[in-house]
Amino acid sequence: MATSVATLSSPPPVSLPLLSSSRSSFFSNCFTVTTRPNTRSLVAIGRRIRQEPTRKPLTCNALFGLGVPELAVIAGVAALLFGPKKLPEIGKSIGKTVKSFQQAAKEFESELKTEPEESVAESSQVATSNKEEEKKTEVSSSSKENV
């Protein structure tokens, strides 16, 4: 019987092609993937690329982070669903609802601002009224016991 000894050696370093071009405006860093000489693990090595200053396109994130194209699609679907005759009515009702929510929020905020000032005065009044009520109940209960 012959015994043989097999040794495992690590594969040579592998350099994978980059997934993005260096001029791409979407990626800010380029990474290459290589293997370490004595291990079998992959390591990402980052390189910083100096980007030329570019102009950002005009964007409008007006409603819940939605852009103009998304809002246009939503408006188109709404026009198809409700028709051109009902859209003004729906717009008016949505506007009234939003206005009422804004008004309620302002009232709530004003109540919160005035509440601390009034709460100090009310707490002293409530404390005195509670004491008066306790005295009245004690007097009425004692008068019932006497009868």
Swiss-Prot record:
InterPro entries in UniProt: TatA/B/E, TatA/E
The encoding gene: TATA
TM region positions: 62-82
Protein purpose: Part of the twin-arginine translocation (Tat) system that transports large folded proteins containing a characteristic twin-arginine motif in their signal peptide across the thylakoid membrane. Involved in delta pH-dependent protein transport required for chloroplast development, especially thylakoid membrane formation. TATC and TATB mediate precursor recognition, whereas TATA facilitates translocation.
Quaternary assembly: In thylakoid membranes, TATC and TATB form a large receptor complex, containing about eight TATC-TATB pairs, which binds the precursor protein. Twin arginine signal peptide promotes pH-triggered docking of TATA oligomers to TATC-TATB receptor complex, inducing a conformational switch of TATA that results in activation of the translocase. TATA dissociates from TATC-TATB upon completion of translocation.
Lumenal side: 60-61
Organism: Arabidopsis thaliana
First and last residues of the transit peptide: 1-59
Family membership noted in the UniProt record: Belongs to the TatA/E family.
Subcellular location per the Swiss-Prot or TrEMBL entry: Plastid, Chloroplast thylakoid membrane
Membrane-topology annotation of the record: Single-pass membrane protein
Alphabetic keyword roster: Chloroplast, Membrane, Plastid, Protein transport, Thylakoid, Transit peptide, Translocation, Transmembrane, Transmembrane helix, Transport
Chain segments carrying region Disordered: 109-147
Stromal-side segments: 83-147
Gene Ontology BP annotations: protein homooligomerization; protein transport by the Tat complex; protein transport within lipid bilayer
Protein name: Sec-independent protein translocase protein TATA, chloroplastic
GO cellular component, as recorded: chloroplast envelope; chloroplast thylakoid membrane; membrane; TAT protein transport complex
A Pfam family hit: TatA_B_E
